[in-house]
C-alpha cells in the first residue's frame, strides 16, 4: 500500500495552532480523551478558580501550561484525569470593580443604591471576561471542563460552605471575638493574616517618625536635677499618639536617666531611654562630665550626661502627663507598664501603647488594667478615635454628652475629620503634607518631641486596594485554626512540595506561626455567614444546609416571627439546578430572615460575609455539593484528596493554605498530595509586569504571532517552574526557530525522501541486532530519553523533561544522526541499510511526537498524525515505554565521546578561522586510562570524519608533550574552605602534572592545607593546557585534545575541492534543481583551481552529480565565486540528456 507523508512549504505554528484546535473542537477531543480512559484509575486534579472580572494575563499561561502538561502526561500514562474549571466570583476584587464602574463608594450602598441592586451588578460584572478566559484556555491548549464549571456564587456551592462552617461550629472551632485585626479603610473590611501575607503586601514606605517626650509626673530624685523629666518613646505612626494610654518597658532592660537639652529649642531636660539605644540618639562625642548651663540648637553636637540607671521593672507604675489631651480615657491610664515584647533593636526601648491600634498594645494594656482611649458615637457605641473610613471621628458623629463631659473640643476640633493617611483621602496626594507631620510640628512647638525624621520602613497594604491597612478593634468571627496547628504541620509533612523549600520554608513557617483565621468581612457580595443570634447574644444557631434553614423559617412563621416562608416554592432535598434557582442565599435576601430561638426570642443573621478565601479553599467539597451529593465519591477517595495541584507562589498563604486548613479541620487530612508552586512571570528586565508601566505582555497577541507551542515550550523549559521567569519574546522566537524549526526540518527531510522512495512505515521491521551501529545508537539514546522524560514528568519536573527532548532532537537526532546518515537516504535502491535508516528515523520522530505532546500539544498532534496517516490524536495514545533491550550504555558513551571531542576540535578550528571543509593532518589525545582510549578508538573513524582530520594519535601524558595548568574555582571552594582558601588556592596552582592527571582520572584528589583535610572534585577547578607551536590545545573535564593546524599544499588543495563542492551545491539549490538532477559544470581556467580539479576531479563530479566537469578559457553567463585569495567564474546548468 502506497501513501505519502505530508510536506509543507514552511513552518507556521500559529496556523498549526488554529487548524489542530479546530479539529479538537469539532471532534470534542477532550471529552474523547476522558471516554478513552473510562474505568481506568483516576488521577485527581483541582483547578484553582480565577476571577473572570479581569482579563487573563501572560502569567496565567505559565500556571496553566504546568497544569496541562502534568494532566496530559497522566492521561497518556493511562489515568482518567477529570479537570473541572472553576470561577471565583465573590469578594473585594469584584466589589471594588463594581464600585468603580458605578462611581460609588461603600458608604453609598444601602443609600443611593440598594444592596439588592448592588449585588445584582456584582453578579453581572463577575463573569464579564468569561469569553476571553475561555478563548485563552482553548487557544493555549489547556484541557479543562469549562462547560460544567464550579461557580462560587452558586447556591449549591454556598450550601456546602455553610455545611463546612456548621461542622467547624460543632467542633468548637468557630467563635466571635473583639480583637485588634488588620483593617483596610479603603476596602471597608477586616483582613485575615493570610491575606496580609500575600506577596507584595508588605512594602517599604517613607513616613514621618518621631521620638516623643512624655513628661514624668512623679520623677525619681535623680531625674529632678536638670529641667523637667521625660520618657522618650519612638513611633512610626504619630497619628496614634492621641490614643496613647500607657508606656511599656522591658522588665530586665537597663534604662538610663540622661541630662541634656531639647535639640530644637535648647530647653534643659532629663530623658529616660534604654541603655543599648543611647548612641542612636546621642553622639558619643557629646558626652560630658558636667552638663553645661545652656545649649544653642545651632550647635550640631548635643551635650549629655548619664546620671543614673534602673531596670525596667523599677520604673513600673510611674506616671506621666497625657501627651495630647483631647480625650480623657478614665482611671488607670498614663503609667508605665512592663511587657516581654519590648526590644532594644530600634527606637528608645520604651514603647508607646495605644491599645486600640495594636495587638501587642491591646494585650499588654488589658493585662495591666490600662484602659483604651474610646469615644462614644451618636448611636451610643464605644469607638476608637479613628473611624472605619480611616479618619479622626468628625465631631458631628459623636455623642454630644460624651463630647462635653470627656473631650477638650477646641483642641480636638482642629483635627476632627482628618484622615490619618493621605492614601485614604481622595482630595490628597502623596506630596501633600500628612497628618503625622502636622502632629509632630504641634508637639515640637509644645516641647514634647525630641526627634522628628523621615524613615523608610516596612508597612502592610491591602492586597486588593494597594492602600495601607490599620490595626483596628473589630467585632469578628474567627476560625480557631490554632487548635489544629499541630495536625496541619503534620499533614504538611506528607505533602510533596515542588520545590521542597516552599513547603518547609514559606508554608511550613507560616503554619508554625499560625494565628486564628479572621473569617468576617463587612461587605455585601459574598457568602453570608450562616449564623443567627438573639440581640443579647445568649442564643444562636449555625445553619448547615438550605433544608435546615427552610425548616427553621417554617418554625419562625408558626411562632409569628415571619409572616410567610419566602422559599415556599423550594423543595428541600431536591438538588437540581432548577430547584435551587428558586432561592438566593446572598444578601439582602437572607438578611430578611428572622428565626425563632428555643426560648422564643427573635434571632437575626450576623451581617458579616465570610472571607472569600474560604470559598476557594472549600472547592474540593463544594464543587461536588458535598455532603448533599457525591458523598461516596468524596469519602472513598475517588475525587478527594487531589493527587496534584499547581498555582503561583503567591497562593502559598492563600489558596494552598485554605485548602490545607479546611481539609485538616474537616477530614483530618490535607486536600492535596503534590503541589507545584510556580514563580512569578516578570518582564525581561526582571520587573513586575503591569499595564500602568506598559510592560505587560498580551497573551493573545503572543499566541497569534508565535503559536501556543513555542510559548508553552519556552515557559516550561526556560527555567524551573518555581523560579521567576524573565519573560522575553526573543526567547519564544528562539524556541520556535531552534527546537520546532529543527524538528520540522528533520520531519521534512524524512517526508521528502520517504515519498521519493515510497517508504510507508508499514514495511517489515529490520531486527534491532541487524541494524547499523548508528541506528542502534540513536535507538538506544531514544529509549534512554523515554526513561528520562517519564522519570522527570512523574517527578513533576517538566523543565528537565522538555530540555532532555530538546537536546535529543537538536543534538542527537538532527545534528548527529540525520547528518551522518544523509547519504544512506540518498542511495539509489531500497537496501536493508536504507530501510533501517527510514525505520529508525520514523520511530524516533513518532516517539518524540508522543514525548513532547504534554508540553506542546498542537504540533505534537500534527506531527503524530502526519507520521501515522491516521485521524487518531496523539493525546489518545499511551506514553512510550522504554525497551531496555535496545539500551546500550557503552555505545552511548562512545558516541558521546565522539560528540564531545568533535565539539572541542571544531571550537579550536573556529579560534583560528579554519573551516571544517579544510582537512588537517593530525589530532592528538592523551587518554587518561585504557578505558577512555578504548572508548575513543571505537568511534575514531567517526571523529576523524566529523572534524576532517587525517590521523588521530594517542600520546602518554607522562611524555610531557602537553603541559597543563590548574586554577581553583573560588565560588565553589570558598564556602567550603573559607578560612584556608588563600592557602588552598596556592596549593592548587602548585599541583604537579602527575597530581593533575590523578585528579582527572579519579575525579577527586585529597590534600591537606594548613592542617585542614581538603577533597577536590574535578568541578572545583579549571584545567587548561598550554598551546605548543603549530598546535592548539583544549580541555573539558578529564578530556584533552591537541590539533595540528599546519595546512600543507596538499591539504589546501583538498580543502578547496570540498569548498567548490559546497558552492556548487548552493548553486543547485538556488537554481531549483531536484535532488536527482544531473548537471554540466564549466569553470574559468585558474592556476590554483585548475590544479585542484585535476587532483580531485572524480570526487568533485560525484559529489555535485556532474555529468561533465570542464575547464575553459571563457565562461559566459557564469557566477563569480569568491575564494578569499581568488575569484572563480563558474557555469552550472541542468544536463539535457
Curated annotation (Swiss-Prot):
One of its GO terms (cellular component) is cytoplasm. Keywords: Aminoacyl-tRNA synthetase, ATP-binding, Cytoplasm, Ligase, Metal-binding, Nucleotide-binding, Protein biosynthesis, Zinc. It is found in: Cytoplasm. It is an enzyme of class 6 (ligase). SUPFAM superfamilies: Anticodon-binding domain of a subclass of class I aminoacyl-tRNA synthetases, Nucleotidylyl transferase, ValRS/IleRS/LeuRS editing domain. The keyword Chaperone does not apply. A motif ('KMSKS' region) lies at residues 688-692. Its main location: cytoplasm. Its EC number is 6.1.1.5. GO terms for biological process: isoleucyl-tRNA aminoacylation. InterPro entries: aa-tRNA-synth_Ia (IPR002300), Anticodon_Ile_ABEc (IPR033709), Ile-tRNA-ligase (IPR002301), Ile-tRNA-ligase_type2 (IPR023586), M/V/L/I-tRNA-synth_anticd-bd (IPR013155), Rossmann-like_a/b/a_fold (IPR014729), tRNAsynth_Ia_anticodon-bd (IPR009080), Val/Leu/Ile-tRNA-synth_edit (IPR009008). A motif ('HIGH' region) lies at residues 50-60. Catalyzes the attachment of isoleucine to tRNA(Ile). As IleRS can inadvertently accommodate and process structurally similar amino acids such as valine, to avoid such errors it has two additional distinct tRNA(Ile)-dependent editing activities. One activity is designated as 'pretransfer' editing and involves the hydrolysis of activated Val-AMP. The other activity is designated 'posttransfer' editing and involves deacylation of mischarged Val-tRNA(Ile). Monomer. HAMAP family: Ile_tRNA_synth_type2 (MF_02003). IleRS has two distinct active sites: one for aminoacylation and one for editing. The misactivated valine is translocated from the active site to the editing site, which sterically excludes the correctly activated isoleucine. The single editing site contains two valyl binding pockets, one specific for each substrate (Val-AMP or Val-tRNA(Ile)). This is Isoleucine--tRNA ligase. It comes from Porphyromonas gingivalis (strain ATCC BAA-308 / W83). The gene is ileS.
